[in-house]
Amino acid sequence: MISKINGKLFADMIIQGAQNLSNNADLVDSLNVYPVPDGDTGTNMNLTMTSGREEVENNLSKNIGELGKTFSKGLLMGARGNSGVILSQLFRGFCKNIESESEINSKLLAESFQAGVETAYKAVMKPVEGTILTVAKDAAQAAIEKANNTEDCIELMEYIIVKANESLENTPNLLAVLKEVGVVDSGGKGLLCVYEGFLKALKGEKVEAKVAKIDKDEFVHDEHDFHGVINTEDIIYGYCTEMMVRFGKNKKAFDEQEFRQDMSQFGDSLLVINDEEIVKVHVHTEYPGKVFNYGQQYGELIKLKVENMREQHREVIRKEQHTAKPKMETVETAIITISMGEGISEIFKSMGATHIISGGQTMNPSTEDIVKVIEQSKCKRAIILPNNKNILMASEQAASIVDAEAVVIPTKSIPQGISALFQCDVDATLEENKAQMADSVNNVKSGSLTYAVRDTKIDGVEIKKDAFMGLIEDKIVSSQSDQLTTVTELLNEMLAEDSEILTVIIGQDAEQAVTDNMINWIEEQYPDVEVEVHEGGQPIYQYFFSVE
């Protein structure tokens, strides 16, 4: 029985909760409703929770109130994506409720879960039921009820998990799109993983780190990040050496402990990955030949690589001497845009953006990433264009905590961001800019072409894995195996008689032949529409479109 939770135990709950979420991040990602290739809910919740965990591990306290402040700060600054921001708000309210306590009992634990729910609902402009919010709410209500009957925090947490799981299983009945696709809510699943980790800690158990399975065809990849902090002659082991050995029947029997011990004599930075049939080795050594000779005792050498790190270091020094790092530009009004692709970044810069944050579908910048840019710019005012619906909440959170006066333009796509930035007037007030830039977002129709990562049926469209998908805003309107067919079906949905301008932003994976045929088709079918084509270089999306 656990009747009290202090800072030490709460820290372990956080650590185990974060680990369990990390172990299940891929599973949570797989529950994403839309088959768009993004690193969405699981990835973002994991990165957010990991940020909170790291802050806690670096600032341990027996006082649960003090530890809660630390945890909340870590989550707040590390929050990525809407799911990560909501997670940070759930625990922001939780931790606010315990900030004056040195330890808490089951009743206060339940009340804190409820306080977190109230904070999170306030943070979301239009709360949707059948999501992480619903699971958190139902779990908190169950906790309040159970706390009247038990003083045991373990028993309380067990009941919370039962009710959270019931709520999760019910999410398809509350959100039609979940039922159509046949999944439960991904954010709710992520939260349940955290709660399950909490219970493990309360029981004195540990969540073992999940070891990622490494593809046999993937060799050890090593980056040597010198940054000129050492002298070339100080490098003791000069050769980054890698080998892959396929075990042989008539060769020496492989014993990993013995192998590691022997290999460690050759150098440092040793990494050994044993995959039953193959062993993969990475080591920094002065004698690569000895490493290879040793490996041959066990079987056939099938992949070898040697890099001279001293020469790499000299090259880094030469480059750093010729290329000074640019200083962060300081401005009165910072215009900050989230961008994906060098071409798109150049478009934003040419239109007046002062600061570009690299991000987008597969890696949403955190609240802290945005805060740092604002602070380093030393601006008095900031205009933030997230250009992705999943970066909107992190942008708003960043705007709310910086000292500068900051506004967020609710751009949910790159085309919307370009349209909004076109309306920006540096001589106008923030509120004037916010009004006219936000208004421009409503006047542009955004579309995109990408590929599906799994089979599904959504919005009445049958989708096969690896097929192309045409989207208008977030709605899938076309999916075919042929790229040009998908594009033309998408554009037929986007273009109308009164359409005047079509902007095409070409991604890094677009095929020139498809682009040429698409432009010819547009000119034939919509001769009155002016077409503007830009090289965007964005990943994942072959094309972005905007119609005005």
From Swiss-Prot:
An annotated GO BP: glycerol metabolic process
Cystine residue pairs: none
DhaL domain: residues covered: 8-200
Coiled-coil ranges from the UniProt annotation: none
SMART domains: Dak1_2 (SM01121), Dak2 (SM01120)
GO terms for MF: glycerone kinase activity
Source species, domain of life: Bacteria
The protein, known as: Uncharacterized protein MW1109
Organism: Staphylococcus aureus (strain MW2)
